Amino acid sequence: MSHYVGRLGRRSPAGSGRLRLHRKPRRVAMLSVHTSPLHQPGTGDAGGMNVYIVELAQRLAAQNVEVEIFTRATTGALPPTVELAPGVLVRHVDAGPYEGLAKEELPAQLCAFTHGVMQAWAGHRPGHYDLVHSHYWLSGHVGWLAAERWGVPLVHAMHTMAKVKNAALADDDTPEPAARVIGETQIVRAADRLIANTAEEAGELVRHYEADPDKVAVVHPGVNLDRFRPADGRAAARARLGLPQDALIPLFAGRIQPLKAPDVLLRAVAVLLDERPELRSRIVVPVVGGPSGSGLAKPEGLQKLAARLGIADVVRFRPPVGQEQLADWFRAASVLVMPSYSESFGLVAIEAQAAGTPVLAASVGGLPVAVRDGRTGFLVQGHDPAAYARVLGDFADTPDLPARMGAAAAAHAESFGWDTSAAATAEVYTAAMHDHRRYRVRGHYG
């Protein structure tokens, strides 16, 4: 069994010789209602899922599976279609006002979005799409209807789940609504296949949503190994970013929201400097990312927290950056810090490791898969700032630790290439198509 594809139940029996001749779909309709793959990760609702969709679609296209991505238009200036890469088309769907709609308000626009998807399909002959792959629960509801209308299988990826998030909320975070829980439960029942990032996420689908284990496939996300690599090293990256060569640099990179817990990093730095004030002159704490959500989600809230903690002089807030510059931030850091309350996988953890930087993370969700505790980084139980401060102190006392662990981290990340992930996803597609056809034939003949 592939390192990337695991089934909680038994594998589907092999298809007939005729089915094996069509192992992959020719064309897939991907749905991403609430965030466009063209948006900058780290801003608003754009994050790891955006990277996931872009990379997966491009690698599927390279493996002769065309992908059309449907997403909601957020400005009237957008063309109806954009070619993201050869074989990958982004289709913008008008659904509600272009600006001012929060993600929480989008369920009211799902009817309009579905109408736009159907309009785009209407110009094609039946069979134009072989499969629907929806991302996040909002897209899952559109995918459910589209797959039924087109007579094709539905593959769905949750990315995050309401019940899991609600069980691990930060103190100042807002619970996911009951309507989302109901919606996710309906999608789990309707989908032909569910893709989970890790075995733990697959288990959560079964425990929390009563998913059929035989429908769940585990496919680890990948990392762009051409972009995220050690390259010319930490010193060169620090020189490009204007960072001191001898500094301890714990980096936070991602959306600024309670779920990601950037405040835990700031509180940990405050604890460290209270205990060891001599480190103040040689620590820099970059926070790279934009606002998302509410409460401490806004950078101003974090800036005020840094001031209250007495560490404003060592914290540097930076807006979201493109993937190439993000790779440089990873290379420059002593350690990437991810104190998240919930992560289905944690793409930035693999990206940082691929760039040669160890990770200090909360032991939640998929992070124990992404990070090898004690070898490529450190995992902390819970969110006590003092626990993170102790590890940061170890990095301060062991100057060769970033390089030593970073080398192991880069080697570890090599096993997470997107080509392998895309090939595994194509296997899931093939299994879904096989079972869907078999079910339809059985239903037709009684």
UniProtKB/Swiss-Prot annotation:
InterPro entries: Glyco_trans_1 (IPR001296), Glyco_trans_4-like_N (IPR028098), Mycothiol_biosynthesis_MshA (IPR017814). Residues 1-21 are annotated as: Disordered. GO terms for molecular function: acetylglucosaminyltransferase activity; D-inositol-3-phosphate glycosyltransferase activity; magnesium ion binding. The keyword Transport does not apply. Keywords: Glycosyltransferase, Magnesium, Metal-binding, Transferase. UDP-N-acetyl-alpha-D-glucosamine binds at residues 40-41, 48, 255, 260, 321, 343, 351. Pfam families: Glyco_trans_4_4, Glycos_transf_1. It catalyses: 1D-myo-inositol 3-phosphate + UDP-N-acetyl-alpha-D-glucosamine = 1D-myo-inositol 2-acetamido-2-deoxy-alpha-D-glucopyranoside 3-phosphate + UDP + H(+). Its EC number is 2.4.1.250. SUPFAM superfamilies: UDP-Glycosyltransferase/glycogen phosphorylase (SSF53756). One of its GO terms (biological process) is mycothiol biosynthetic process. 1D-myo-inositol 3-phosphate binds at residues 34, 45-50, 103, 136, 160, 180. Mg(2+) binds at residues 330-331, 333, 357. HAMAP family: MshA. PANTHER family: D-INOSITOL 3-PHOSPHATE GLYCOSYLTRANSFERASE, GLYCOSYLTRANSFERASE. Belongs to the glycosyltransferase group 1 family. MshA subfamily. Catalyzes the transfer of a N-acetyl-glucosamine moiety to 1D-myo-inositol 3-phosphate to produce 1D-myo-inositol 2-acetamido-2-deoxy-glucopyranoside 3-phosphate in the mycothiol biosynthesis pathway. Homodimer. This is D-inositol 3-phosphate glycosyltransferase.
